[in-house]
């Protein structure tokens, strides 16, 4: 499972406050905690006012890259911001994200022409009309973006498709549609990654962590192999290790057992 750590996003009030107050220790501690918990990438999103977003994102990136070896997932809704910070990454990471909206593909895809071939990309199934409400349209958008990405040396196995799962509180068949989208996309591109912002499914519901955890487990079963999530959540990480073992991806449950011995999952052990 590819884990994109979500805890350094300016949309989170405490992170926004840390950015405004230039609290380096807060940013550093959150980066280290996510890296130690097992994040594959650490998402950095300033999410501040447009006029200071670039400056804030550069500041965050500097702190995180000094603190941990985990690659960055550079995150902004503005493709020009991503283009500006792309060369500042000390090692290949993840670009979050491209879509069919505006000029995002025109600005971002050329970055991969001569880039290290281990760079990867998140692609969201939306366009200028917004998020489609049909499975067929999302699969169609995926095909359009992937075929365009291929022109810039991006193979499907370096792309994380986010089918933009809808909140279950507003769409009763949200998970079932997500399942159908995964099946439709993988039929065309068997080795492409499927990702999701786990918390989207539970928007507007009580006990959101419970819904998020069960959504993740079911989604892994139907083929999701990447997620934007909180790696410091013991319950979520425990569910990932357990599900991976149940799906036959963990020989003799070695990873599950190792995670328990390391104190990453299960009850907090007294020292």
Curated annotation (Swiss-Prot):
The UniProt catalytic activity note for this protein reads: methyl-Co(III)-[quaternary-amine-specific corrinoid protein] + (6S)-5,6,7,8-tetrahydrofolate = Co(I)-[quaternary-amine-specific corrinoid protein] + (6S)-5-methyl-5,6,7,8-tetrahydrofolate + H(+)
Q: Gene3D superfamilies recorded for this chain? A: Dihydropteroate synthase-like
Q: What induces it?
A: Up-regulated during growth on proline betaine or L-carnitine.
**Pfam families (UniProt xref):** Pterin_bind (PF00809)
- MF annotations from Gene Ontology: methionine synthase activity
Q: What are the residue boundaries of the Pterin-binding domain, all occurrences included? A: 1-247
Tell me its EC number(s), please: 2.1.1.-
What are the entry keywords?
Methyltransferase, Transferase
- UniProt KW Methyltransferase keyword: yes
On assembly, the entry states: The proline betaine:THF methyl transfer system is composed of two methyltransferases, MtpB and MtqA, and the corrinoid protein MtqC. The L-carnitine:THF methyl transfer system is composed of two methyltransferases, MtcB and MtqA, and the corrinoid protein MtqC.
**Sorted alphabetically, which PANTHER family does this protein's record hold?**
METHIONINE SYNTHASE
The record's family statement is: Belongs to the vitamin-B12 dependent methionine synthase family.
Q: What does this protein do?
A: Involved in the degradation of the quaternary amines L-proline betaine and L-carnitine. Component of a corrinoid-dependent methyltransferase system that transfers a methyl group from L-proline betaine or L-carnitine to tetrahydrofolate (THF), forming methyl-THF, a key intermediate in the Wood-Ljungdahl acetogenesis pathway. MtqA catalyzes the transfer of a methyl group from the methylated corrinoid protein MtqC to THF, forming methyl-THF.
User: What protein name is recorded for this chain?
Assistant: Methylcorrinoid:tetrahydrofolate methyltransferase
- Biological source species: Eubacterium limosum
The lineage, from the top, is:
Bacteria, Bacillati, Bacillota, Clostridia, Eubacteriales
């Amino acid at each position: 499972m590819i884990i994109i750590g979500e805890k350094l996003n300016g949309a989170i009030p405490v992170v926004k406050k840390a950015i405004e107050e230039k609290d380096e220790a807060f940013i550093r501690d959150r980066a280290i905690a996510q890296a130690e918990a097992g994040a594959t990438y650490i998402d950095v999103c300033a999410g501040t006012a447009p006029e200071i977003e670039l400056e804030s994102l550069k500041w965050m990136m500097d702190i995180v890259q000094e603190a941990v070896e985990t690659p960055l997932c550079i995150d902004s809704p503005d493709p020009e911001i991503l283009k500006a910070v792309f060369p500042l990454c000390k090692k290949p990471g993840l670009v979050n994200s491209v879509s069919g909206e505006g000029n995002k593909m025109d600005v971002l895809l050329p970055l991969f022409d001569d880039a290290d071939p281990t760079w990867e990309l998140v692609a969201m199934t939306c366009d200028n009309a917004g998020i489609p409400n049909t499975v067929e349209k999302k699969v169609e958008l995926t095909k359009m973006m992937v075929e365009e990405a291929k022109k810039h040396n991006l193979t499907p196995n370096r792309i994380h498709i986010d089918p933009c799962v809808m909140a279950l509180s507003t769409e009763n068949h949200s998970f079932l549609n997500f399942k159908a989208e995964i099946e439709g996309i993988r039929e065309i591109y068997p080795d492409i990654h499927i990702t999701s912002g786990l918390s989207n499914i539970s928007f507007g519901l009580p006990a959101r962590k419970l819904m998020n955890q069960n959504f993740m487990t079911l989604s892994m079963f139907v083929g999701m192999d990447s997620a934007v999530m909180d790696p410091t959540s013991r319950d979520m990480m425990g569910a990932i290790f357990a599900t991976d073992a149940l799906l036959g991806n963990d020989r003799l449950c070695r990873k599950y057992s190792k995670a328990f011995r390391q104190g990453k999952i299960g009850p907090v052990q007294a020292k």
